[in-house]
Amino acid sequence: MKPLAVTLGDPSGIGPEIVAKAWSRRKSDQIMPFFAIGSAASIQAVSSIPVVAITDPNEAISIFDQALPVWDIPSKETITPGKPNKAGAEVAFAALEKGVALVKQGQASALVTAPVSKAELYQVGFTFPGQTEFVANRCGIAADDAVMMLAGPDLRTVPLTIHIPYRDVLEQLTPKLIISRARVTVEDLKRNFAIPSPRLVVAGLNPHAGENGTIGREEIDSIEPAIRQLQAENIDIKGPFAADTLFSPRARATYDVALCPTHDQALIPIKTINFDNGVNTTLGLPIIRTSPDHGTAFPLAGKNKADEGAMVAALVMAANSAHNRQAYAQNSIDG
């Protein structure tokens, strides 16, 4: 398989540090070869690991055991850990463009993206709500057809609505949206995670899942019709269930992924249960994309205090997903 492509994110954040630390765990965690894309200087500013510049992803395979291969995108200004600037945002933007292009061209097996600062990116022409929507756009996929899934060793969740105010959730949470997100989720749990018959559950929006309409009708008017349609398509999906009881160990054993009406319903349990190794992966794309489920953490940058666990988990998930998708495609041909 081709190496993984890993963007460094904002070079003033913890991205360079966690990528360097992940490379240092390449043997103990059996991480497949990868190359970083971004400012090589930003890695050298926070780590003493050996770095080798490359101009061809194929070079990464032979270099990886001895040094971190880097597709260098130099900054126009000095990069200072913890102090983001426009030049750093330009590097992060360019790295993301390059990473998507290389994976689309088949020169890398999957894309792993370190955290960026959207506030900084907006200063240099970035117009998307986040990296998920950017990657979908560059892959020719409508934003509504790209599904964010958060995953850890103990739980997977999908937020049905993402970065919108709560007052807008009621309008966006339609049967059409739920059905679309569920279909994409089922397909990629099969392709990327080798789960032949995915089990889905849906959380209610209102307290106690609406109490049969006495605390809101979203469950009756939007969620239940979607579930009935999906069940008619032979998808294993149940709900709506009260969100406050859906994430206990006993409940989690009954499903493979929980679809959650709101952003925080999906992210709070992941960050509570799997804070140090949660991964954000985008479903519905022609490529594999994962990301550690945390931000740039500018106050930690340059202090050697950043935990690389989520980056390691994102690398492992990307490699496994690429392998599973390849096997799924081959089985489809053979079958």
UniProtKB/Swiss-Prot annotation:
EC category: oxidoreductase
EC number: 1.1.1.262
Binding site residues for substrate: 132, 271, 280, 289
Gene3D superfamilies: Isopropylmalate Dehydrogenase
Compartment(s) of residence: Cytoplasm
Pathway annotation: Cofactor biosynthesis; pyridoxine 5'-phosphate biosynthesis; pyridoxine 5'-phosphate from D-erythrose 4-phosphate: step 4/5
Entry note: cofactor: Binds 1 divalent metal cation per subunit. Can use ions such as Zn(2+), Mg(2+) or Co(2+).
Subunit annotation: Homodimer.
Family to which this protein belongs: Belongs to the PdxA family.
Designated name of the protein: 4-hydroxythreonine-4-phosphate dehydrogenase
Source species: Zymomonas mobilis subsp. mobilis (strain ATCC 31821 / ZM4 / CP4)
Lineage of origin: Bacteria, Pseudomonadati, Pseudomonadota, Alphaproteobacteria, Sphingomonadales
Gene name for this UniProt entry: pdxA
